[in-house]
Amino acid sequence: MKYVIIADLHVTIKGYSRSVNGIPEHIYYPTLNLHNAVDYAKENNATLIIAGDLIDTKDSVHQMVYNYLKDELEYAKNTVETYIVAGNHDYTVYNDQMFSFLKYVGIPVAFSGNPITINDCVLIGHHWDKEKIKEDFQNIDLETTRLIVSHFGLKEALAGNTSYKGGEFSISDFSEMKDTFLILGHYHKPQKVSDNIYYVGSPNPVRVDERDDEKRFILVDTDAMTIKSIPTIYPKYKTINLDKETELDLDEIKEDIVNNLSNYVFMIPDNYSKKIEIKELQKEFSGYVFTYDVEKNDKNEELIDDEEMVTLSKININSIQEEFLEKSGVPKNDYQKYIDVINQII
């Protein structure tokens, strides 16, 4: 059996979105890559699986996001056999009730507590409580199942191009699955975590710290037990390491941003003479130009987001979480349970 798997589209609309063929780019590129995944599945006689996080803002779906995404989902279900795994951005819970736009798209969706079996493949939806995910795994027959697709974090995996790891599960939790692929959504960095565990990754960068990723969707062949990466289409980031004397043609850069949809990351040393001009460029093209102030001997820095302007290498996320829990009066023995929930939310 063959399966095309795409994950973490995070279709959204932002105030600074550039237009591509009359469509905001944060809608255009993820839906374009979904469309291409559908076509690839058809060409290869494969089933299409969308492994969660179709949208970015789960509490309210912008009408334009819904319309374009629903059109592509209609195209998918009318073209190939299509299934969806619910991700943490695809639903919200209120008074113990789960609400999701995915209930209305006319495609089978694996929600927590309702796994879907397709031939030799099992789909398991996301849940905040890892015990609920475990329950869905308990009834899987590993003798006949060659592929499991789900949406959660692993401690051994990279969430992005950083050393931050905060998953609720470990590779050891799936040690019995030696002859079964586990393909996951949730972390945006495409990666092989072990011999049989992979993250698809997002098809286009969702945050600036994903700028060096080779984005993709994948083809899984459970007869040959192989995985093939198919590159996706998205605007690229250009990282420029400035020194004291670097000369920049700002008009050329502006033209590149507007006409070629390029994004720029400037690493600015303390002694750079035109720092003000670069900062002004960042203000003019907020969301497309990112700056980072680098000390002369600064190494191993990881830029994660223009708005936060912090580095994961400098911040121990777990220590911040533990400090917050301590101040909130949470017993130390319960820290990990709360940290797992926090990591799912962020």
Predicted regions and their residues:
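Conserved catalytic scaffold of divalent metal-dependent phosphoesterases
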Residues: 69, 75, 90-172, 203
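Acidic, histidine-bearing metal-coordination/catalytic regions of metal-dependent phosphoesterases
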Residues: 1-17
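Conserved beta-sheet core of the metallophosphoesterase superfamily
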Residues: 161-224
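Short acidic/histidine-rich motifs immediately flanking catalytic phosphotransfer sites
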Residues: 43-47, 144-145, 261
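Active-site environment of divalent metal-dependent phosphoester hydrolases
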Residues: 10-13, 56-59, 85-95, 114-117, ...
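Active-site neighborhood of phospho(di)ester-bond hydrolases with catalytic His/Asp-centered motifs
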Residues: 5-7, 48-53, 81-88, 109-113, ...
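Core catalytic region of metal-dependent phosphoesterases/phosphodiesterases
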Residues: 19-115, 175-176
